[in-house]
Amino acid sequence: IFECVFSCDIKKEGKPCKPKGEKKCTGGWRCKIKLCLKI
């Protein structure tokens, strides 16, 4: 499972790719260079 390397607080479509307190991205989001990507 891919883990976020950067703290990804940027929200896209109203949903954070990495909720605060979580170590992994959820909901199909992935963090890439501090950007949220839906895969």
Curated annotation (Swiss-Prot):
Q: In which tissues is it expressed?
A: Expressed by the venom gland.
Q: Which cysteines bridge via disulfide bonds?
A: C4-C17, C8-C31, C25-C36
What keywords is this UniProt entry annotated with?
A: Calcium channel impairing toxin, Disulfide bond, Ion channel impairing toxin, Neurotoxin, Secreted, Toxin, Voltage-gated calcium channel impairing toxin
User: Pfam families attached here?
Assistant: Toxin_20
**Gene Ontology terms, cellular component aspect?**
extracellular region
**InterPro entries in the record, alphabetically?**
Hwtx-2-like
> Where is this protein localized, as stated in its record?
Secreted
Q: Which PROSITE patterns does this chain map to?
A: HWTX_2
Any GO MF annotation of the entry: toxin activity
Segments forming a coiled coil: none
Family designation: Belongs to the neurotoxin 12 (Hwtx-2) family. 06 (TXP1) subfamily.
Explain the purpose of this protein: Inhibits voltage-gated calcium channels (Cav) in rat cerebellar granule cells. Has insecticidal activity to crickets (Acheta domesticus). Is not toxic to mice.
Q: What else is known?
A: Negative results: does not inhibit insect and mice voltage-gated sodium channels (para/tipE, Nav1.2/SCN2A, Nav1.5/SCN5A).
- What is this protein's name? Omega-theraphotoxin-Ba1b
